[in-house]
A protein has these predicted regions:
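An amphipathic, hydrophobic-aromatic interaction surface with interspersed Lys/Arg
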Residues: 1-92, 96-280
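Short acidic DE-rich linear segments
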Residues: 283-300
Length: 300
């Protein structure tokens, strides 16, 4: 099984929160992994996503739970892009262009997403009004449960970066009660720490050229395409039948999808050849069948 080294310069964090001897290697998903993905549902999304990612990683001098959430998302994007050929992007539908009123459908590839790299590695913020120093951290996989609560809540989002033993809600209340300048300073410091995949995509209308900003909701629930066990087994059986290949659970899934494309082309070519033979046979049959006008009837 091949593993690819992830360079720190490619990570949203630039590796600034990992030791210099840390090494992250990743492989694509196998048939076994995609079968496990078939058990995916909303209630177990985080658990299965974490288990699949952990299976596909080789870590040196780094614990899985200490991976930054921004880097986790990058690694999941890598996994999706390099595992799946047919569903490596997101389908965007805009009901109505604001200019020409045309509906827009476009597939956005994952490599179209812009990465916001870390600007500052701050681990404290001094609040002058309270005369205290607030310890800060970058959220990691350990904080994933809390991170699920912060969507559309600015205070909970900021609270995620405070490194104390208080609950997320207690940290949020502390932030809400800060005086103006202390709040501004804390928010500015944390905003400069933030990094990750930029979720706003510019979509161009094919009719009038109008550019529309679309914000994608990217979460564990929609990170991967869910294929049923029945579909997986049917695909493997089909490849075995037409390509005479024995696909095991250790096969990289991307190779299975490539074989599927080859088999589909084989079937298409065979069908086209069959249609040609049928057409040829009909043509020959018609050539040997005398027309009614040329048949001489005996006189009575």
């Amino acid at each position: 099984m091949n593993y690819w080294k992830i360079e720190f310069n490619d990570l949203p964090s630039l590796g600034q929160y990992y030791s210099l001897d840390t090494e992250i290697r990743i492989r694509t998903m196998t048939v076994r992994d995609v079968k496990y993905l078939a058990t995916f549902n909303k209630s177990n999304a985080i658990t299965i996503t974490n288990e699949l990612l952990q299976r596909c990683l080789k870590l040196k001098h780094l614990k899985f739970e200490d991976i930054l959430l921004a880097d986790r998302e990058y690694l999941l994007f890598w996994l999706r892009t390099n595992t799946f050929i047919r569903s490596s992007g997101y389908q965007i539908k805009i009901p109505e262009c604001p200019t020409c009123k045309n509906s827009i459908e476009q597939e956005v590839k994952l490599n179209s997403f812009k990465t916001d790299y870390i600007k500052s590695k701050s681990d404290t913020c001094f609040l002058d009004g309270l005369n205290i120093t607030i310890p800060l951290k970058h959220p990691t996989i350990k904080d994933l449960k809390d991170a699920r609560l912060v969507e559309n809540d600015e205070f909970l989002d900021l609270a995620l970066y405070i490194d104390t033993d208080n609950s997320l809600q207690d940290k949020a209340r502390f932030i809400m009660n800060l005086q103006g300048m202390d709040f501004v300073k804390l928010k500015y410091t944390i905003d400069n720490m933030k990094c990750g995949m930029h979720k706003t995509i510019q979509v161009k209308c094919p009719i009038c050229g109008e550019i529309t900003d679309v914000k994608l909701i990217v979460a564990d629930e929609n990170m991967f395409t869910h294929t049923s066990i029945k579909e997986i087994l049917e695909l493997i059986t089909r490849i075995a039948k037409y390509a005479n290949l024995q696909i095991t659970d250790d096969w990289p899934w991307m190779e299975v999808e490539i074989e599927q494309e080859i088999v589909n082309k084989m079937i298409k070519d065979e069908n086209a050849e069959t249609q040609k033979e049928i057409a040829k046979a009909k043509s020959q049959a018609n050539a040997h069948t005398p027309s009614t006008s040329s048949v001489k009837h005996p006189r009575i």
